[in-house]
Amino acid sequence: DRIAVTRICEVLELKAQVAAAVWPGFDDPQFEVPLVYFTDSLCYAVNPEARFLAQYPATLRYRDGELKIYTTPTIDSLEFHMQGTISLDPADAGSAYDYRSAYLLCSSPEITARCIPGTEEVAIWRTMVLHEYFHGFQFRHPAYLAQFEASGAGLIPSSELVGHYQRYGWYKESVDRENAFLLDALRQTDAEIIRRDIDGFRKLRAERHARMRRELAPEAVGAERVYETMEGTARYIEFHACPGGYDLDANDWLYRTDISQYMYATGFNIVRLLDKLGVDYKTRLFDEGLALDGL
């Protein structure tokens, strides 16, 4: 119990630090996301809600003020967990502990290291957990949840958009050029050049989105905007959660569209550009259910 509780508390402390330094409100109690931490033998549930406690036999193991950590038998048989979870299916209203209520599921550092090469350092594991924690934070905002449901993202998985990127030359060429405009704007210091880069990005994106609506699916555009906002901001949190920060030159997967799922990279770059331009977006993005490329 001691090791698991210590690691959970370290994650919560890091979350508070990132909230203070990078994203105000991330640790606000009204957006609290219950955490389920998996070991090889049991689960630790951090501030679970009543539906979870009614569904699984739980024993209170640790309490410190408002923080309560319970243990339960392992709640599923999956080998690895590192994701936010929320059910939006009305059929789950009476049965799912996460019905319209985001949770974070994460495996212990030991399980994570076994399943994901390159994650042996606990510090790297913490950045992964913070990334997923931020997804729960997003879905705890009613306006963002409404935007997600209205966008078509629930019908079109991000893998389908990545498939379009890999399959259609016009799609990939435009996405890569859009990202090149963002990266150039991040490098430049001349305001006029930055403005031209932003205009170039918007023109290319508008043309691609129009073609997506004609040739693919109208819902694909809304889904892309939601995933870009969701994953770009979570990658931004992960970036800032890394001790000392990631070396961008050595970690080009963070910002290149041809290495990771492209929405992660473009979203991450838009967030960094908004920071550079001094745009007040963090207090509005999820409260108002906005998309990054509309700011």
Where are these regions (language model features)?
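A general structural signal for short secondary-structure junctions and capping/turn motifs
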Residues: 25-28, 93-96, 118-119, 129, ...
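Active-site recognition of the HExxH zinc-binding catalytic motif
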Residues: 127-140
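Short, well-ordered loop/turn and helix-capping segments at boundaries between secondary-structure elements
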Residues: 139, 143, 276-279
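Active-site scaffold of zinc-dependent metalloenzymes
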Residues: 60-122
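Pan-zinc metallopeptidase signature
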Residues: 2-21, 203-295
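Post-HExxH zinc-binding segment in Zn-dependent metallohydrolases
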Residues: 140-216, 220, 224-246, 267
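N-terminal mature-domain "stem" immediately C-terminal to a signal peptide or N-terminal signal-anchor/transmembrane
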Residues: 1-74, 123, 127, 234
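Mature extracytoplasmic/lumenal regions of exported proteins
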Residues: 122-123, 137, 144
